[in-house]
Design a protein with these regions (language model features):
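Short hydrophobic alpha-helices and adjacent helix-cap/hinge residues
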Residues: 1-320
Length: 321
């Protein structure tokens, strides 16, 4: 996509605090397991790259002073379970999980520290006791901030004349997807919008869901990470455009599929921060005492090409972060 076709507004990242004392035995090369959610490093794309950069930021080089064992379950529940067990059997020092893999990582071990990434509701998912004091062997980084939902809806209302009805794509099998629906409905009611849920449990169910939205005369649809299968990110933009529905996304990667607008936490930034907690744990910190970190960098994108195809005129001066 050409630069002039979208606008980017970026927030700032915050420090994650002081280091702790050395705890790894001298000369021991730490082994880190990484349980992804897609089927390959190529599919993970910017997230895979960001995690590697995060380790390099701290002086870790894979194969030299750290060993990274990657597993790619391709969003298959049975593969999540098997691969989490594989990593534990390797006697890793820390298990890093991405997205829905966190629950499988937690169930696989009660002794190996687990650092999760991109989990919207770690308390509701029973990963931690609280955000401030996680307890147990699990901590990590959430990608959810409730105030983002209201801002997305406000942006849509400013951009789309006469907006009154919004669809939300929901995966009923994922608890966090239902959480997003509840928060969206609450935020929408405060500004006079109604929200209708449309379900999709897999990539195959996405097209029928968008057909149902069009039949119901939905003007816009909001999506969240848990409501869209990872492999479905690349097609939802075209599904929305072809049905003349404005898509409001949550990340740069989803935006690039053709969404009208995206506003949310930078998932790449979260992946790049995760090694900081791995480093702290290797140096003696306990996961139970490391608070769950919220997002600190936010991104907004407006796609002028998509707006034109939908017959919308974007007044840049009216949009506020």
């Amino acid at each position: 996509m050409r630069r002039r076709e979208f606008i980017t507004l970026l927030g700032c990242a915050a420090s994650l605090g002081p280091r702790v004392s050395q705890a790894q035995p001298a000369g021991k090369i730490p082994k880190i397991g990484v349980l992804w959610h897609a089927g390959s490093a190529e599919e993970e794309g910017p997230y895979f790259k960001a995690l590697a950069e995060g380790f390099r930021d701290l002086g870790y080089v894979d194969g030299r002073n750290i060993i990274l064992e990657h597993r790619f379950p391709n969003e298959m529940p049975e593969r999540f379970k098997v691969m989490a067990a594989e990593l534990v059997a390797l006697k890793i020092d820390v298990l890093v999980s991405v997205g829905n893999g966190a629950s499988y990582a937690k169930n696989a071990t009660t002794t190996i520290p687990v650092v999760f990434m991109l989990i919207p509701d770690p308390v509701g998912a029973h990963l931690v006791s609280s955000l401030a004091r996680p307890g147990g062997n699990v901590t990590g980084f959430t990608n959810f901030a409730a105030e983002l939902v209201g801002k997305r809806l406000q942006f849509l209302r400013e951009i789309i004349p006469g907006l009154s009805r919004i669809a939300q794509l929901v995966n009923p099998n994922v608890q966090a997807s239902r959480l997003h629906l509840d928060v969206t409905r609450s935020a929408a009611s405060e500004i006079g919008l109604s929200v209708q849920a449309f379900e999709a449990r897999s990539v195959a169910e996405l097209e029928p869901a968008f057909d149902a939205m069009a039949a119901a005369s939905m003007q816009a649809v909001t999506v969240n990470p848990e409501g869209v299968p990872f492999q479905g990110r690349a097609i939802i933009g075209n599904l929305a455009i072809s049905r003349r529905i404005a898509l409001c996304a949550y990340s740069k990667e989803t935006f690039e599929s053709g969404a009208l607008i995206s506003y949310g936490a930078s998932h790449s930034a979260i992946c790049r921060h995760a090694p900081v907690y791995v480093d702290k744990i290797l140096k003696g910190a306990k996961p139970s005492e490391l608070p769950v970190q919220g997002p600190t960098k936010f991104e907004m994108f407006l796609n002028l090409k998509t707006a034109k195809s939908l017959g919308l005129t974007i007044q840049i001066g009216r949009a506020h972060v």
